[in-house]
């Protein structure tokens, strides 16, 4: 983009632009017509049959490998971004030829060969090559109207990566990239994008004054082989100040729907729909002041997680969080609102402790096993005396459960109020 100079506007006509890597200058704008696609892969069209397998020769790409030790259970070659797709579906990598099966591929890096487990003839086969679509440290860049897909983005890196200040990334479809779909830095905005089916995670961001609004974030975190509880799922935000996450629809991700982790302060989650994410809904972890309000949650974390893990709203070793006016439907399983304290040390603004959190005026629909409350496996006394409070909430359960309400120990709803003084102005509706 150097030919246009700083502040230039570029227009991409409809069409597929393969293996392009754009490094914007200060203030540049990149716009796409409907049907403009940045595709980080090459088409594979020539195959030979070798010992009953189909082989593409001359594959010299080898993407940067990060965090190969952060593997999901049973995954092979996690952190290897050299993805292969058949008809827009990512195949599963295996690490030896004798494990090749239908739906898998084996990349023999020594021989520069990709082996496929299925006959590719008549199919569209693509191999991810380029590590990013649009990325630079310039400030004030705008990216809008593009489809960005199939980039060999390393773990924790993004296909669109605004590493400078004030990027605006809007109205794009970002899909099928190995690592992360979109990343921004301070005073950046991610607006009205459809971010889906990326291998590790949909979004990430860090810095001050960030706005995440109006995005659909769906079905991310399923195929990179990286453990999503280490980092993956819908979106993760780190070391932010004044982060606003508003009116997004985050659903069906493998991991948390939305996640603030490490030294986030003055965070707001407002008006989001968070549905059917495997690990839980919103997780605010080892961070500080936040407001989580007027969000709706359905079906998050209902995958057999114990303790208060998998809550629709989960606060881990964080303080000064107000949780109010949320609607939580956990009738298919999972926990409601969980405050969790463990031994996590200290961060930029003090100890990572679960204190001074207020949970009020929320409506929850629970199973008889779904939990609510505060638990600790470290310095429980500090958490219990730390000003955490539950009040004026409404709980709906199909039948009366025993010991669903936690404040250190577990209690019935009646004893949650009578013994520990929580939820005194709340109600439990059975049936």
Question: What residue ranges belong to the model's regions?
Answer:
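Extracellular parallel beta-helix/beta-solenoid repeat domains
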Residues: 1-431
């Amino acid at each position: 983009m150097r030919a246009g100079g700083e502040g230039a506007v570029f227009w991409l006509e409809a069409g597929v632009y393969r293996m392009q890597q754009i490094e914007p200058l200060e203030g540049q704008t990149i716009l796409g017509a409907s049907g403009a696609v940045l595709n980080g892969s090459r088409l594979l069209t020539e195959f030979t049959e070798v010992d009953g397998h189909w082989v593409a020769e001359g594959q010299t790409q080898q993407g940067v490998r990060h965090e190969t030790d952060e593997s999901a259970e049973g995954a092979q070659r996690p952190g290897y971004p050299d993805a292969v797709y058949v008809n827009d579906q990512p195949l599963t990598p295996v690490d030896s030829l004798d494990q090749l099966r239908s739906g898998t591929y084996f990349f023999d890096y020594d021989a520069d060969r990709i082996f496929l487990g299925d006959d590719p003839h008549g199919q569209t086969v693509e191999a991810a090559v380029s590590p990013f679509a649009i990325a630079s440290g310039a400030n004030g860049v705008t990216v809008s109207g593009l489809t960005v897909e199939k980039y060999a983005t390393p773990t924790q890196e993004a296909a669109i990566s605004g590493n400078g200040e004030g990027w605006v990334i809007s109205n794009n479809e970002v899909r099928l990239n190995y690592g992360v779909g979109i990343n921004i830095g301070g005073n950046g905005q991610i607006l009205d994008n459809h971010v889906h089916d990326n291998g590790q995670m949909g979004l990430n961001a860090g810095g001050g004054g960030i706005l995440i609004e109006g995005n659909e974030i769906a079905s991310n975190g399923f195929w990179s082989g990286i453990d999503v509880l280490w980092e993956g799922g819908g979106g993760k935000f780190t070391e932010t100040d004044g982060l606003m996450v508003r009116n997004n629809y985050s659903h069906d991700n493998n991991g948390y729907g939305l996640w603030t982790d490490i030294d986030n302060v003055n965070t707001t989650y407002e008006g989001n729909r968070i549905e059917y994410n495997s690990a839980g809904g919103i997780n605010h972890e080892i961070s500080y002041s936040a407001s989580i309000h007027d969000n709706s949650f359905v079906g998050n974390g209902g995958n057999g997680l114990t303790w208060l893990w998998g809550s629709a709203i989960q606060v881990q070793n964080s303080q000064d969080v107000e949780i109010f006016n949320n609607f939580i439907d956990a009738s298919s399983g999972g926990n409601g609102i969980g405050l969790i304290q463990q031994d996590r040390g200290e961060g930029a603004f003090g100890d990572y402790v679960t204190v001074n959190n207020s949970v009020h005026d929320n409506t929850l629909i629970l199973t008889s096993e779904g939990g609510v409350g505060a638990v600790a496996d470290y310095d429980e006394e500090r958490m219990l005396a730390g000003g955490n409070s539950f009040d004026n909430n409404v709980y709906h359960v199909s039948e009366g459960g025993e010991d669903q309400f936690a404040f250190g120990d577990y209690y019935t709803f009646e004893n949650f109020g009578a013994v520990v003084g929580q939820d005194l102005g709340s109600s439990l509706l059975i049936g």
